């Protein structure tokens, strides 16, 4: 993950490996998204870059989309190990207050995460930055009512929100 913000001019001038190293992290452990978006340079706006990355995700095979979903960590779940989270995920989960859960709340979240994962075969994904611990718990419970196809679509939409925020943070 880049520490200092980059300009679009800098990104547009980069070769593919440098471009991927600078923005590939925006889509959790899925640099292939940035690799595909690089083809659409030059980007006039951050929205152009985001749109290119979304095109790559939405045109990917169902298997690649599922791999992207599965690359995401559980939100405050028992399976979460802080050392395994990316810096961005750690910061986003902390911002939603997930690092401040009581033992009871953490156990409840872990049970919901496990049920979700058992039901759908992938982790529950929600843009933590736009939520707090309570709204995350409520969304998790409500989304257990969805079909697997609905949840794949919702998860990709949440990944899109996460990617947009991360790109906005990284690019001036």
Q: Where are the predicted features?
A:
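Aromatic-anchored, charged helix-turn/loop surface patch used as a conserved interaction hotspot
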Residues: 4, 8-13, 25-27, 32-112, ...
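Surface-exposed, charge/polar-rich loops and edge strands
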Residues: 19
């Amino acid at each position: 993950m880049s520490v200092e913000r980059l300009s679009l001019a800098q990104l547009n001038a980069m070769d593919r490996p440098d471009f991927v190293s600078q923005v590939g992290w925006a889509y959790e452990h899925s640099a292939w998204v940035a690799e595909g978006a690089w083809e659409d340079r030059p980007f006039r706006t951050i929205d152009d870059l985001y749109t290119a990355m979304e095109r790559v995700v939405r045109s990917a095979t169902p298997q690649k989309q599922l791999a992207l979903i599965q690359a995401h960590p559980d939100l405050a779940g028992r399976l979460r190990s802080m050392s395994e989270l990316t810096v961005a995920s750690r910061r986003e989960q902390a911002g939603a207050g997930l690092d401040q859960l009581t033992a009871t709340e953490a156990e409840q979240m872990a049970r919901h995460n496990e049920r979700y994962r058992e039901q759908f075969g992938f982790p529950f994904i929600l843009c933590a930055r736009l939520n707090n611990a309570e709204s995350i718990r409520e969304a998790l419970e409500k989304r257990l009512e969805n079909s697997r196809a609905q949840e794949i679509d919702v998860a990709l939409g949440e990944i899109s929100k996460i990617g947009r925020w991360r790109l906005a943070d990284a690019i001036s």
